[in-house]
């Protein structure tokens, strides 16, 4: 039956079983011999021994993946969240990421807005009477309609682009002065129509025929 040799204690164990090896490694003499062995050798040699032991364990098993490290080709975190360790934070909203479509090549800094390669965002369409990219100016008291706000629509029955001509213009009859034929005075208070003809009372019923109202 094969035996296990301990390099630290320089002895052979009785059996090469896991239970016997664990019992020997937990012993007081074995632990003291391990400490003395690493104290005798130099620091550089001790580090090389530790690296060799670590590499042997890594060769036998697979490395545990780190959840913080994203695999190649993964999407970056959304805007507003910090980047993963070893990864640049996401660019601000409206700027393409490096290496993407219409973006800067990897390793190049992001140009500022308006610089070479990244134009300013398009301005808002200019308002009537306002500057390009700005808000419409407020109307003033002596400013005619249409400077900053749409004009007042014409009265009903006229086309949208119709302009009312001044009095006495060609093609339109002149307005008669008050008291002339064709001029209808404005109705008095409480009347919604033209004045009643003479001979009628205030009532809406017609008066008696002539001759009936005379005394006999």
From Swiss-Prot:
Zinc finger extent (Matrin-type): 4-36
Compartments it resides in: Nucleus
GO cellular component, one term: U2-type prespliceosome
Descriptive protein name: U1 small nuclear ribonucleoprotein C
Function statement: Component of the spliceosomal U1 snRNP, which is essential for recognition of the pre-mRNA 5' splice-site and the subsequent assembly of the spliceosome. U1-C is directly involved in initial 5' splice-site recognition for both constitutive and regulated alternative splicing. The interaction with the 5' splice-site seems to precede base-pairing between the pre-mRNA and the U1 snRNA. Stimulates commitment or early (E) complex formation by stabilizing the base pairing of the 5' end of the U1 snRNA and the 5' splice-site region.
Compositional bias of kind Pro residues: 68-80, 87-198, 206-216
Gene3D superfamilies: Classic Zinc Finger
Oligomeric form and interacting partners: U1 snRNP is composed of the 7 core Sm proteins B/B', D1, D2, D3, E, F and G that assemble in a heptameric protein ring on the Sm site of the small nuclear RNA to form the core snRNP, and at least 3 U1 snRNP-specific proteins U1-70K, U1-A and U1-C. U1-C interacts with U1 snRNA and the 5' splice-site region of the pre-mRNA.
Classification via InterPro entries: Matrin/U1-C_Znf_C2H2, Matrin/U1-like-C_Znf_C2H2, U1-CZ_Znf_C2H2, U1_snRNP-C, Znf_C2H2_sf
Chain spans, region Disordered: 68-216
Primary localization: nucleus
GO molecular function: mRNA binding; pre-mRNA 5'-splice site binding; U1 snRNA binding; zinc ion binding
Source organism of this protein record: Aspergillus fumigatus (strain ATCC MYA-4609 / CBS 101355 / FGSC A1100 / Af293) (Neosartorya fumigata)
The keyword Metal-binding belongs to this UniProt entry's keyword annotation: yes
Membrane spanning residue stretches: none
GO biological process, one term: mRNA 5'-splice site recognition
Family: Belongs to the U1 small nuclear ribonucleoprotein C family.
Keywords from the UniProt entry: Metal-binding, Nucleus, Ribonucleoprotein, RNA-binding, Zinc, Zinc-finger
Pfam family, one: zf-U1
């Amino acid at each position: 039956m094969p035996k296990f040799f301990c390099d630290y204690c320089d002895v052979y164990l009785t059996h090469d079983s896991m239970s016997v090896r664990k019992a020997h490694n937990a012993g007081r003499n074995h632990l003291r011999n391990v400490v003395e062995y690493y104290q005798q050798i130099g620091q550089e040699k001790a580090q090389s021994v530790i690296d060799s032991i670590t590499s042997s364990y890594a060769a036998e098993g697979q490395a545990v993946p780190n959840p913080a490290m994203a695999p190649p080709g993964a999407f970056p975190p959304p805007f507003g969240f910090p980047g993963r360790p070893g990864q640049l934070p996401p660019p601000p909203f409206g700027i393409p990421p490096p290496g993407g479509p219409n973006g800067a090549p990897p390793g190049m800094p992001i140009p500022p807005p308006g610089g070479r390669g990244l134009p300013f965002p398009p301005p808002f369409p200019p308002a009537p009477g306002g500057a390009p990219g700005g808000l419409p100016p407020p109307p003033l008291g002596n400013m005619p309609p249409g400077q900053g706000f749409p004009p007042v629509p014409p009265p009903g029955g006229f086309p949208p682009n119709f302009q009312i001509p001044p009095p006495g213009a060609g093609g339109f009859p002149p307005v008669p002065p008050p008291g002339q034929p064709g001029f209808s005075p404005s109705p008095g208070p409480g009347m919604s129509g033209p004045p009643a003809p003479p001979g009628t009372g205030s009532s809406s019923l017609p008066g008696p025929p002539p001759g009936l109202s005379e005394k006999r």
